Amino acid sequence: MPIIAAKPMTAATDAGLPVTKMVLVSAVALIDRDGRVLLAQRPEGKAMAGLWEFPGGKIESGETPEAALIRELHEELGIDTAASCLAPLSFASHSYAATQTHPAFHLLMMLYVCRRWQGRP
């Protein structure tokens, strides 16, 4: 089978948008015993306020995606879980154009599933 050379990836992705910053995020689909999935609504004052999303947040320097989720779930929802309860599910990669209030960036999000945690979100 012949090998086909692909164009190398550059900072200009998707629709050719220049990317100034890469944002690494981890998020989780929390699924309870009844099969319900918890979604969070983005707060006023943040980009894309009012939209719904999976809980999670930015991965800090030196932090694994799992550690970021454990930290974010504790900070945002007051629940605790372990890395062994986080199952990788998928990822998303998307470029966002600059707006009047935010510079262009590329989001790379790792998505996990979690069915076991302590506390009530």
Residue ranges and their predicted role:
Residues 1-5:
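N-terminal acidic, proline/glycine-rich, low-complexity intrinsically disordered segments
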Residues 6, 12-37, 58:
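Conserved N-terminal beta-strand and adjoining loop/helix that marks the start
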Residues 23, 32, 90-121:
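Active-site-adjacent beta-strand/loop module that shapes the phosphate/pyrophosphate-binding cleft
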Residues 31, 59-63, 67, 102, ...:
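Short, solvent-exposed loop/helix junctions and linker helices
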Residues 36-75, 80:
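Conserved Nudix-box catalytic region and its N-terminal flanking loop in Nudix hydrolases
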Residues 37, 49, 86, 106-111:
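Structural motif
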Residues 80-90:
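A short coil-to-beta-strand element that immediately follows conserved catalytic motifs
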